[in-house]
């Protein structure tokens, strides 16, 4: 890289100048170097830049520094093309200069590594060259004269006529050149050194200030004649500009008045810039480095030789090759220059070439360049240079970092640049002049010229340009798209809040353009610039905030100030254009989800712009109409009007659904906010309101919205919510809209600015006749696609597997058209999905919305007269977003129970489906109106698999077999009545679902994005009561690997997991407290830690555990048992109510947990009944319930299963009595209840079970085997006296019920102690004596209060002073 020569020159400044220069120089004599050193020292001592007449250096402190800064700013792009543009004139000068042995080694890259070694990597070679290259005036004059003679001999007609050394001739500048540049040239021309006129040929390069050599006709020799006259002119003149040290006043760098300090600073900058230019030459990909290289070449040519300068003006690739060539042959002229091997053309011909080049470049600029963006970029660098170049120390050490290797692209503005931006001149004025230069290399001579860096000259001819053109083709395409747009509103970008990172080019070319893929461009290439102008112009008049290209509009999280009728916190219009081709930006580089940009988008303007664009985008009819949508719900007398003219103020969202799930109205033709890929969401399909707002501004927890809850609970058809800005109309495919017109009442539409298309727009969530009139439900057309099919809040995974066809084959039990007991994926897992991959991922084949085979939550108020949701009612049909045109399927049923590929299709037994049981299915199963969509709250909130499970909601239809004309009929009727009154209502279920969804949305913040939350427990199984809490399980996002929880032999495995659970729950406890929507936090550090808190709005208590996969599998098992027989749910609910009444249903108080009570009921129905009512699922389907299989993500918590065809015909009353009798006589000491085996197991066997969660000391009083981890679920019942009281309650209840067959008798307090149970009285005395010393199992009296095989009949003693329950409770407490 010709480093030796330069190193010698640069070492002149060092302390050991003489020695180092002698050793470093390769072609210069010692005398010349010494003379240079002496001259420089004299100049420094004098405090002036030169010992000569200070004409040229009169303003050295100012112009020299500015020139240095200019050179630093001018990206090396200039040098790359300019090097190739070196004219034959330069060659002539080079040849003449070759005769001067002192300067042959100083080719373009004379700034090479030797100098870099001592002076760092800088881009300001100019200042150093300027100072260093000023030998004695005599020596300079001699060199100048010699150079002039040589060049005149070679060609007197060179365009570089001004090169005649001592003649201060300044040629006309390029149109791009600024007046300041011309002044600079004139200044340099005044210096007799040499005034290099900016080459007219180099039209693109701003004012080819070849005068750079004028001030520095120095040791480097090379008369100031500047080699750049090349007609190719891509950047050659720019190189000259760079080389013009003192002349280039256009550089924006800070001006140094102190000449000595300026000289020193310039020296460092020069050395740095030269080394930087060497890097630029080496890295052909860096336009900046090349531009610096151009500067170096000119500067080098000033002092060294036109040879070096000519090489600098070559293309990047040839520049490197020439450098190597010159190293090998320092005294020979390289022959690989462009146009140097051909005979010189006359000046007239060159001028003609210039004219042609100018025309071509102007055309290229008009077609491929955005001048405004370049001006912004240059202004940016200018501001940066002003800010960072105030001391030379920074230049020395930071210069190589100032232009990172990839900064062919714009640099992001700093705060200082924001402040400087308004003070800088507008770029629009200069953009017009830039049309003359197609090279668009942001010429340094034009301080604020808008040369786009990526406009590589369409004039240049050579491999270097072709490579660059290939590299920056994407940038050129983008600039073509946005040229007029940027010129139109360039002035608006001077706002201090303009974010430079969103550059005007609009397609992510901010980052390393040469790496951007071809598909990176934001808008279609055929979109006209005029359309873009219209697209952005309205914003300029409305606000001075950032105006982004349409490709930037897909940034997902951006608050918008006063968005037009944009519901929710995220003021975006998520309106997927189904079938739209080429009109939706496909840019994959989205703004960071958490990096909010305050912008305002006029959707109407964007729509007009898109329609006015050169290419006609596919426009959906519903988008053009822009109607005032009035929704008239069936239950509402006053229609709710949605007026797009209103601008609702931005309000804090009171519901996550409004923030992330509510689609905004489709006001514009193009989807300006296409959803980003799910990867940006952390693998989740929903957005977190917390990411953009404080918890206090989020929804009110469980209810999310009272109106939605009321509508969901009562079947109300309200279409508005008090906490939401009215939602705009949803988008439906035109085909579906037409179908919907046939079967549903169109929503009245108001006037619109555009003529309404033939199919009038419809509210997607309006209620069709089928909803209000179930009899007409079947007439509904195929369901419309989800309006949020491509919304980040509603990923494509939500579709039903019916549409996608990805389901694993139809299940054998899915043959009943309307009563098929098939259910989509469980809400219990919907959040964690137990599967984020399943429900929230695009690859999910989960069946969410089927037509008839899918049970739905259809309230059908007219049919049932209540908010009952039958599990067999056809579900609201919404097709899979990826398969929108899937035809309705009335006979065929798709598989259910699949969660993101985790399907249990092989689970169900292969037997013909029996008719739906009357107790579960609705007498009139009717599908919800599918064409118009289901209830509006279903559309607003994320698809909820829970809501589609009617079995989890109240059952109102009395079973046919409830009354069997026997003595137990009254008892059975009472049980059923109490069950209906206590079961989980639809309203409560909705509230719980909204509470879960709130937490699910809330968890989509960076802190908890790797976790998922799922519903478990009685809420999902159907065994819950209306007063029961909601159980949730927190799972890590990566899920539980099947081998992760295998039975580890590690001794501390369980303790480690428990510690992790405590840490995570403690973190959640701290963060949830800040939401101000929960209260009564309590972290229970039990064996399975639980975080308990309560919803303030609805009083719903939440039990949250961490990574408890066993609880998920239990939920899965129990919900299957609940479906197998209609008597299971009523029995479980009644037993739970009974236990709660007698205060024996509290694990914290050493009594039986609800889960243990459920297992006890199931065990009774499995084992104690003859014949049994329930089978043993572990025996029937061992593959589904393998021990150690802890992959909870494979489970579909609401997987349907056929009812079990039991031979047992006993009634509810008979089973309840049998339950009490069975456990009144059960041998709890020796046997354990086992659902896994469908029988009982010896306690000793259970103690020896090998399980990481099993403990020998768990098995004490009440022993119930956990079906999966083989632990004792009733381990909380470890206190003997407490369990004796529990057994007494069982016994007394059995006696009462058997004696009276009246359900009310078991819900009465037990006031008296049985007189024939002296053991109980003895126990009471023992309780008093051993209050603080619990009685061991061996100390208990035999019989234990009636647990023997032959209990003694008891009579009630009304005279007892104290009750058994009160006494035992007092002592136990």
Curated annotation (Swiss-Prot):
Gene3D superfamilies: 1.10.1410.10, Beta Polymerase, domain 2 (3.30.460.10). One of its GO terms (biological process) is positive regulation of antibacterial peptide biosynthetic process. It is found in: Cytoplasm. Expressed in ovaries. Not expressed in adult males. Residues 96-112, 295-340, 430-442, 855-866 have a biased composition (Polar residues). Residues 75-155, 175-340, 425-543, 734-770, 802-866, 880-928, 1320-1359 are annotated as: Disordered. Residues 1211-1272 form the PAP-associated domain. Mg(2+) binds at residues 1029, 1031. GO terms for molecular function: ATP binding; metal ion binding; poly(A) RNA polymerase activity; RNA binding. It catalyses: RNA(n) + ATP = RNA(n)-3'-adenine ribonucleotide + diphosphate. Residues 486-502 have a biased composition (Basic residues). Disruption phenotype: Pronuclear migration does not occur in activated eggs. Defects in spindle structures (abnormally shaped spindles, spindle spurs, ectopic spindles associated with lost chromosomes and mispositioning of the meiosis II spindles) correlated with very high frequencies of chromosome non-disjunction and loss. The polar body nuclei do not associate with their normal monastral arrays of microtubules, the sperm aster is reduced in size, and the centrosomes often dissociate from a mitotic spindle that forms in association with the male pronucleus. Pfam families: MTPAP-like_central, PAP_assoc. Interacts with orb, an RNA-binding protein, generating an ovarian cytoplasmic polyadenylation complex. Interacts (via C-terminus) with Dcr-2. PANTHER family: POLY A POLYMERASE CID PAP -RELATED, POLY(A) RNA POLYMERASE GLD2. This is Poly(A) RNA polymerase gld-2 homolog B. It comes from Drosophila melanogaster (Fruit fly). The gene is wisp.
């Amino acid at each position: 890289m010709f480093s030796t020569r330069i190193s010698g020159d640069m070492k002149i400044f060092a302390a050991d100048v003489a020695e180092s220069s002698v050793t470093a120089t390769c072609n210069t004599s010692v005398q010349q170097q010494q003379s240079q050193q002496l001259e420089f020292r004299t100049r420094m001592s004098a405090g002036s830049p030169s010992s000569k007449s200070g004409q040229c250096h009169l303003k050295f402190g100012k112009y020299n520094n500015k020139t240095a800064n200019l050179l630093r700013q001018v990206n090396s792009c200039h040098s790359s093309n300019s090097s190739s543009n070196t004219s034959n004139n330069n060659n002539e000068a080079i040849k003449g200069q070759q005769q001067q042995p002192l300067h042959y080694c100083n080719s373009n890259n004379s700034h090479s590594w030797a100098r870099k070694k001592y002076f760092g990597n800088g881009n300001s070679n100019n200042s150093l060259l300027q100072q260093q290259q000023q030998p004695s005036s005599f020596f300079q004059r001699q060199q100048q004269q010699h150079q002039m003679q040589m060049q005149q001999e070679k060609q007197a007609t060179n365009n570089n006529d001004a090169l005649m050394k001592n003649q201060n001739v300044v040629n006309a500048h390029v149109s791009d050149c600024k007046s300041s540049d011309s002044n600079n040239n004139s200044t340099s021309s005044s210096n007799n050194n040499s005034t290099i006129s900016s080459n007219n040929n180099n039209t693109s390069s701003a004012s080819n200030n070849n005068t750079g050599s004028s001030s520095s006709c120095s040791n480097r020799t090379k008369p100031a004649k500047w080699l750049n006259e090349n007609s190719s002119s891509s950047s050659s003149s720019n190189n000259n500009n760079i080389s013009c040290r003192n002349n280039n006043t256009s550089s924006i760098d800070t001006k140094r008045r102190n000449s000595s300090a300026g000289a020193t600073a310039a020296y460092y900058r020069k050395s740095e810039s030269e080394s930087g230019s060497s890097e630029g030459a080496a890295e052909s990909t860096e336009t900046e480095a090349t531009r610096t290289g151009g500067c170096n070449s000119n500067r080098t040519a000033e002092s060294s030789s036109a040879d070096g300068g000519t090489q600098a003006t070559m293309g990047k690739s040839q520049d490197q090759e020439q450098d190597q060539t010159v190293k090998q042959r320092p005294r020979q002229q390289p022959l690989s220059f462009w146009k140097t091997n051909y005979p010189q053309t006359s000046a007239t011909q060159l001028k003609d070439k210039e004219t042609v080049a100018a025309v071509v470049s102007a055309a290229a600029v008009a077609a491929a360049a955005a001048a405004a963006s370049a001006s912004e970029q240059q202004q940016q660098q200018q501001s940066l240079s002003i800010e960072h170049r105030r001391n030379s120390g920074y230049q020395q050490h930071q210069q190589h970092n100032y232009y990172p290797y990839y900064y062919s692209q714009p640099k992001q503005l700093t705060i200082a640049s924001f402040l400087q931006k308004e003070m800088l001149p507008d770029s629009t004025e200069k953009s017009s002049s830039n049309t003359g230069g197609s090279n668009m290399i942001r010429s340094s001579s034009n301080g604020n010229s808008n040369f786009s860096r990526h406009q590589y000259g369409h004039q240049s001819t050579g491999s270097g340009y072709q490579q660059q053109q290939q590299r920056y083709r994407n940038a050129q395409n983008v600039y073509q798209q946005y040229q007029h747009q940027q010129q139109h509103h360039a002035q608006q970008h001077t706002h201090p809040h303009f974010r430079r990172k969103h550059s005007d080019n609009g397609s992510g070319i901010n980052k390393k353009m040469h790496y951007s893929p071809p598909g990176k461009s934001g808008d279609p290439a055929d979109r006209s610039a005029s359309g873009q102008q219209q697209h952005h112009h309205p914003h300029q008049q409305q606000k001075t905030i950032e105006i982004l290209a349409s490709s930037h509009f897909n940034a997902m999280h951006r608050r918008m100030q006063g968005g037009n009728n944009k519901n929710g916190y995220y003021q975006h219009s998520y309106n997927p254009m189904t079938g739209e081709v080429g009109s939706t930006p496909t840019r994959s580089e989205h703004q960071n989800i958490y990096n909010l940009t305050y912008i305002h988008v006029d959707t109407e303007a964007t729509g007009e712009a898109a329609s006015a664009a050169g290419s006609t985008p596919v426009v959906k009819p519903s988008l053009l109409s822009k109607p005032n949508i009035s929704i008239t719900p069936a239950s509402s007398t006053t229609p709710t009007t949605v007026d797009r003219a209103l601008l609702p103020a931005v309000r804090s969202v009171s519901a996550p659904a409004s923030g992330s799930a509510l689609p905004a109205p489709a006001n514009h033709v193009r989807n300006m906010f296409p959803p980003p890929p799910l990867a940006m969401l952390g693998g989740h399909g929903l957005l977190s309101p917390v990411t953009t707002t404080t918890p206090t501004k989020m929804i009110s927890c469980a209810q999310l919205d009272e109106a939605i809850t009321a509508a969901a609970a009562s079947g109300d058809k309200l279409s508005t919510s008090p906490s939401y800005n009215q939602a705009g109309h949803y988008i439906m495919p035109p085909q579906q809209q037409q179908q919907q017109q046939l079967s549903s009442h169109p929503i009245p539409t108001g006037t619109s600015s555009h003529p309404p298309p033939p199919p009038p727009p419809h509210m997607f969530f309006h209620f069709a006749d089928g909803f209000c009139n179930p009899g007409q439900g079947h007439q509904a057309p195929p369901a419309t696609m989800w309006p949020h099919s491509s919304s980040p809040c509603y990923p494509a995974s939500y579709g039903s597997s019916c549409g996608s066809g990805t389901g694993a084959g139809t299940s054998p039990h899915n043959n009943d058209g309307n009563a098929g007991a098939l259910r989509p994926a469980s809400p219990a897992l919907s959040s964690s999905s137990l599967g984020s991959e399943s429900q929230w991922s695009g690859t999910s084949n989960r069946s969410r919305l089927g037509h008839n085979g899918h049970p739905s939550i259809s309230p059908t108020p007219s049919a049932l007269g209540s908010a009952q949701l039958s599990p067999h009612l056809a579900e609201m049909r919404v097709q899979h977003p990826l398969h929108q045109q899937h035809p309705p399927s009335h006979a065929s049923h798709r598989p259910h129970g699949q969660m993101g590929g985790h399907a249990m299709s092989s689970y169900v037994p292969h037997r013909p489906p029996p008719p739906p049981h009357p107790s579960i299915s609705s007498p009139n199963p009717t599908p919800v109106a599918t064409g118009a969509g289901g209830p509006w709250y279903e559309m607003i909130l994320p698809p909820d698999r829970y809501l589609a499970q009617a079995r989890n909601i109240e059952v109102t239809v009395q079973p046919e077999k409830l009354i069997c004309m026997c003595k137990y009929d009254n008892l059975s009727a009472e049980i059923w009545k109490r069950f209906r009154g206590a079961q989980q209502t639809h309203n409560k279920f909705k509230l719980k679902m909204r509470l879960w969804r709130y937490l699910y949305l809330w968890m989509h913040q960076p802190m908890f994005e790797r976790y998922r939350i799922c519903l478990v427990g009685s809420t999902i199984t159907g065994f819950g009561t209306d007063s029961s809490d909601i159980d949730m399980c927190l799972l890590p996002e990566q899920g539980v690997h099947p081998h992760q929880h295998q039975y580890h032999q590690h001794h501390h495995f369980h303790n480690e997991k428990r510690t992790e659970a405590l840490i995570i729950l403690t973190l959640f406890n701290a963060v949830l407290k800040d939401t101000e929507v929960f209260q009564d936090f309590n972290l229970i550090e039990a064996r399975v830690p639980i975080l308990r808190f309560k919803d303030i709005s609805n009083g719903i208590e939440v039990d949250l555990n961490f990574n408890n996969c066993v609880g998920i599998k239990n939920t899965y098992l129990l919900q299957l048992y609940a479906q197998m027989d209609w008597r299971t749910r009523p029995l479980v609910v009644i037993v739970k109510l009974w236990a709660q009444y007698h205060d024996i249903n509290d694990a914290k108080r050493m009594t039986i947990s609800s889960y243990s009570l459920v297992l006890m009921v199931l065990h009774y129905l499995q084992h104690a009944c003859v014949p049994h009512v329930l089978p043993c699922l572990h025996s029937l389907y061992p593959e589904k319930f393998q021990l150690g299989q802890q992959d909870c993500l494979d489970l579909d918590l609401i997987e349907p299963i056929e009812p079990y065809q039991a031979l047992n015909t006993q009634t509810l009353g008979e089973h309840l009595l049998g339950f009490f009798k069975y456990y009144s006589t059960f041998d709890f000491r020796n046997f354990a209840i086992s659902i896994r085996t469908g029988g009982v197991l010896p306690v000793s066997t259970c103690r020896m079970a090998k399980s990481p969660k099993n403990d020998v000391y768990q098995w004490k009083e009440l022993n119930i085997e956990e079906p999966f981890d083989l632990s004792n679920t009733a381990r909380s019942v470890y206190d003997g006296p407490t369990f004796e009281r529990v057994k007494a309650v069982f016994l007394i209840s059995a006696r009462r019920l058997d004696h009276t067959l009246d359900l009310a008798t078991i819900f009465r307090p037990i006031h008296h102690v049985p007189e024939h149970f002296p053991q109980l009285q003895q126990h009471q005395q023992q309780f008093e004596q051993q209050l603080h010393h619990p009685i061991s199992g061996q100390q208990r009296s035999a019989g234990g209060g009636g647990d023997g095989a032959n209990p003694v009949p008891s009579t009630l003693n009304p005279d007892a002073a104290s009750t058994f329950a009160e006494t035992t409770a007092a002592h136990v407490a």
